[in-house]
């Protein structure tokens, strides 16, 4: 009792399962991910008796063409849940909540990419203990949809690979950027075909299905050759000069006096 399984059917349909209702169940969990099932009626994850506090908060996932976050175990369905260590939990029909509900959404607090209802967060740091609450179960079987950062997580600080399983040829990514990449930097999503998408504000992009994408901060590329005004000006004794290049090139910066004589060569690359 209390185990979950992957099942694959050639066609859609339904069946009736007869048996004795299960109103209480003790489930032994292994350390890390476990595939479990519930009782003969809906039960909240927050009403489960977890005397050893072994369940990692926020790690109950159901499946509907891809993983979906869950807080209710529905009869007849399987769920992934992650445990800090091995131990036992007890499910009881009609039990009251043992812990207060928690919202693990970082919408409005971090940058986000949303694909098929799955949110990936980036651009913020969280504690090592909280990171486990953003971990994801083992990848589903082929034919399902799945998106995650490498390392089986849905949160990243800056540069990260995005791994995708998609039975379709394309998919749409919605993005919401609220934390800048930094001065003269942009958040950029790159494909394996060297296509790059700059992520600013909110929007959507439709991309071809590939196994991996790269999300990272990149310097903003100038569109023209520019030599900026020195600063400060006037100065004594030091000043700074800045220049922009739209592509990698050899650069020479030379200072001449009013008579056209060379005074100094500042850059020669």
Language-model features and meaning:
Residues 72-74, 166-168, 200, 208, ...:
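Surface-exposed coil/turn segments at beta-strand junctions on protein surfaces, enriched
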Residues 78, 190-222:
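Short, compositionally biased serine/threonine- and acidic-rich segments at solvent-exposed termini, linkers
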Residues 2, 76, 210-212, 248:
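Extracellular Ig-like/FN3 beta-sandwich strand-entry sites
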Residues 10, 84, 244-246, 267-268:
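Residue-level recognition of strand-loop junctions within catalytic nucleotide-signaling folds
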Residues 159, 170, 204, 212, ...:
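A generic structural signal for beta-strand entry/edge sites
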Residues 1-185, 191-195, 199, 259:
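N-terminal exported-region signature
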Residues 217-231, 235-257, 265-266:
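Glycine-centered coil/turn sites that cap beta-strands in beta-rich domains
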